[in-house]
Every structure is written in C-alpha cells, then in structure tokens.
C-alpha cells in the first residue's frame, strides 16, 4: 500500500528531520486490505519511521494527546480515529502541538 | 467484512455521512474541541476569525489609531496571531498600526532559524519587524549564559530576560499595546501551575486578557479562548509558514507535567480547558492577603516589587561570575520567611523545567 505520511509541529525531528515520507506499507499477514486501519499504521510508523523519543509520538496504542492527525486533510476524530480505514494513496498528516517555537 | 460494513467504513472515513454543522452544504474536516461541532474548512475559517474578533471587541482590547506590537517568535501561535490580526484589522477597520517584535536570545541553531521565519512573515504580511537581542540589552547571549551555568536554571534567566526584553522592544517601537499569542491551552496550564505553586499574585493575573495596564505597556492575549488544536489546524489549512522545534537548552521543558495533564484532560473532555480558565477567573483572594507592591528597580527603572528587578539581580550575578545569585526560592517581600517548604521532588522538578516561555506572564 502506497501512502504519503507527513510529520509537522516538530515531529519531523523524530524521523530523521524528514517532513514528508512516501512509504510502502506491507499489509499484516493475511489481512484483507479493507481491514487496514490507523491502528495498524501507527504500529508500523513506530516500528519503521520513529528513530528517537517514541514517547513524543505514542502513548499506549494511540498518538500522544496533543498530536493531531489528519487523513486526507480531514480530522481523524471525524473518521473514527484508530478505526479509520486507510486506503492506497491516502495522505496522513501528524502535527504536534507539544513543541514550543 | 460485509459490503454494508465496508460502505459504512468508507462513508465514515470520507465524512460523507453528514455535512457541516454550520452550512449543511460541505464536507466537514474538523471537530471543534470547544463545541464538538463538525464543520467544513470555510466555516472553520469564519468561526475561528469571528470568535477572535468578538473577544477583541467585547474586551475592548484596542482603540482606533493605536500602535500595536505582536510578540513574534516564529512559532505557530504568533504566526497565526500576526496573520489573523492583520486580516481583522483590515476587515473590521480597527485602525491599528501593527508591528512584529522579536526577541533574539542568542541560541545558535534555534533562534536564528526561527527569526528567519519571522523575517519571511514580515514580508508576507507587510508588517515592520523589530528585533531586540539579549546581547544588545544585557551583554549576554543564552549561549554565553549556558556556558557559564550549564543547563540547569538557564531557563530562569531566559524567561526573566525575555519578559523584560519584550517591554523594552515595545518601548523602542513606541507602541501602545503588546499582543502575545498565548492560547487557551497555555492559560489553563498556567492556572494549574500557579495553583500548585501557591502563587496567588500570579494566579490573579494569569487569566486576565489584558495585564500591565499600570506598567510600561499593556499586554493583551486575543487568543485567550482559542484552542491550540484550532490554531494548528488553521495554520495547516492556510499553509502558514511557521517554525517549530523545542529550545535546545531546555529539551525537557515540554515534559512539564501540567502541559501533559492538560492534553490528557482535553482528550477526555475538551471543554475542560475553558472550564479551568473560568475557575482561574473566579478565584477570589482575601482582601487581607498581602500582595507584592509594584515599584521600580533602582538600577534600570523597570517595574519591580524589590529594590532591584530580577533581571538586574541575575545580570549582576553573571557579571560577577556568581551566576547563582537570584536563583532559588524567593523569600517574599520582607525576606523574613525562615521556613523552607519541602515539595515533592518530581513536582518541583517539573515546575522548574517549565520555567520559560508561556509561563512567564
């Protein structure tokens, strides 16, 4: 599955200071592509992209409070948060409000 | 997954199952934390800007003809503030002369990058920019200070110097008002911290939308009731140019437990942020309680409740090679408190690590 992931608000510092990542996410073993959700994606991101201080991004199995998530420019609170279904070519943006400026 | 469930998941994801709560025409893109309304991008811009306008009008923050400086760090809050204030000034004919005021703390690799952002904002928004540096005002950069004292307590110097530097910069610009981008989340956080510190003088001030009316230059917080989530979403949708990274000398400042607590509360019940601000506003201090009296510093003339202002005390310590002067618990107006109240280590540490930026009201 081809996705574009964007990290902002300081989160890019956790990912080699790269703001935009075009990634190819393998579906979990045997999973139907319609079952790929934000929950799976967060787990994948934590494993594959976060290089330092994962606690700034994750708390438990979801993003840390203060991190905003947009899926195709839409607040994930409207689409089911962790249960949001992710499809090929989706754009997912993570923005932290925790870093000062 | 049945096709029915699949369709529901798709429509849920696309937000097509309902329309914007306000216009009932377009796809919603945002759930507002303070109202839980699901609204579209265009309505979001409109309500965001209109609410800030109402805060400005109802609190009479400005008068026509005033010169107003916007404290500009290059971060999201001040960038959105500069953009929105320019828009509202035009749209509603406030009649203000607006300026950007930046403080250069002299932190290599951090402030120089964020100041580049403010310089771009100066061009993008057409607002004249004044930069005031610690080096010019105090003879010391934060790089110098950290070399002298290390990372512990350096935020105390920076917070004290920055607050005064903003006033000095505002005086240079000859402005009538200074506005800062403190948002609802910042203020709720400060209410909690001042309660935990038992700082009743600050507690009565930290929820005021305008402070310092008896000081050199009044400060206003037009974003007092604006949620940080909305500021970030507004900046994102408008593609505003801002800089975000934490200060390299306080890498743990963002871990302050009050900030984390506020974010946890917001996730559970977003309205809690406004409720905490309301609680802060409603605190009543007994009239018999002695409050520090404001005077002026003997040395530099800045407002101070002591003979010397905090900045001069810290500066004297630096210049004498005794940087610990002025660090540590204040003894009160008369300096006659003998008791050293013990605080839990983690609380004191967390409070200390947050001694910078938005805490310094």
From Swiss-Prot, chain A:
Disulfide pattern: none
Location within or outside the cell: Cytoplasm
A Pfam family recorded for this sequence: Urm1
Residues where 1-thioglycine is found: 101
Keywords: Cytoplasm, Isopeptide bond, tRNA processing, Ubl conjugation pathway
InterPro entries: Beta-grasp_dom_sf (IPR012675), Mopterin_synth/thiamin_S_b (IPR016155), Urm1 (IPR015221)
Pathway assigned to this chain's UniProt record: tRNA modification; 5-methoxycarbonylmethyl-2-thiouridine-tRNA biosynthesis
GO process terms (BP): protein urmylation; tRNA thio-modification; tRNA wobble uridine modification
Homology family: Belongs to the URM1 family.
Record-given protein name: Ubiquitin-related modifier 1 homolog 1
Organism encoding this protein: Arabidopsis thaliana (Mouse-ear cress)
Gene from which this protein is expressed: URM1-1
């Amino acid at each position: 599955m081809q996705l574009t992931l964007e990290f902002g608000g300081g989160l890019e510092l956790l990912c080699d200071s790269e703001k935009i990542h075009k990634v190819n996410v393998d579906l979990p073993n045997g999973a139907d592509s319609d079952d790929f959700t934000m929950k799976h994606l967060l787990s994948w991101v934590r494993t594959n992209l976060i290089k330092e201080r994962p606690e700034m991004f994750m708390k438990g199995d979801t993003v840390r409070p203060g991190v905003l998530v947009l899926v195709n420019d839409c607040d994930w609170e409207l689409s089911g948060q962790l249960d949001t279904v992710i499809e090929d070519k989706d754009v997912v943006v993570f923005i932290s409000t925790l870093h000062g400026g | 997954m049945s096709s029915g469930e699949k369709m529901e998941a798709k429509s849920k994801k696309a937000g097509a199952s309902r329309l914007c709560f306000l216009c009932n025409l377009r796809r919603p893109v945002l759930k507002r934390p303070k109202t839980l309304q699901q609204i579209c991008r265009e309505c979001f811009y409109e309500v965001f800007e209109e609410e800030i306008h109402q805060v400005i009008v109802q609190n009479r923050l400005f008068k026509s003809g005033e010169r107003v400086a916007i404290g500009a760090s290059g971060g999201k809050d001040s960038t959105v503030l500069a953009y929105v204030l320019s828009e509202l000034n035009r749209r509603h004919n406030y009649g203000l002369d607006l300026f950007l005021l930046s403080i250069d703390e002299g932190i290599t690799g951090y402030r120089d990058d964020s100041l580049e952002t403010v310089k771009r904002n100066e061009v993008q928004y057409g607002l004249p920019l004044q930069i005031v540096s610690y080096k010019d005002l105090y003879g010391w950069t934060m790089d110098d200070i950290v070399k002298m004292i290390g990372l512990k307590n350096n935020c105390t110097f920076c917070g004290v110097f920055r607050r005064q530097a903003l006033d000095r910069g505002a005086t240079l610009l000859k402005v009538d008002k200074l506005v800062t981008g403190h948002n609802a989340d910042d203020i709720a956080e400060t209410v909690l911290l001042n309660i935990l510190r038992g700082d009743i003088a600050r507690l009565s001030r930290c929820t005021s939308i305008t402070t310092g009316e008896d000081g050199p230059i009044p400060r206003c917080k037009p974003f007092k009731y604006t949620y940080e989530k909305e500021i970030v979403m507004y900046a994102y949708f408008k593609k505003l140019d801002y800089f975000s990274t934490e200060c390299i000398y306080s890498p743990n400042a963002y871990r302050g437990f009050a900030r984390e607590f506020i974010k946890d509360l917001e996730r559970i019940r977003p309205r809690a942020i406004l409720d905490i601000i309301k609680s802060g506003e409603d605190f009543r201090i007994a009239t018999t309680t002695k409050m520090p009296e404001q005077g002026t510093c003997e040395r530099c003339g800045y407002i101070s409740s002591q003979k010397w202002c905090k900045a001069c005390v810290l500066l004297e310590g630096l210049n004498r090679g005794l940087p610990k002067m002025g660090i540590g618990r204040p003894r009160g107006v008369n300096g006659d408190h003998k008791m050293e109240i013990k605080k839990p280590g983690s609380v004191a540490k967390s409070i200390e690590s947050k001694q910078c930026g938005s805490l310094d009201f």
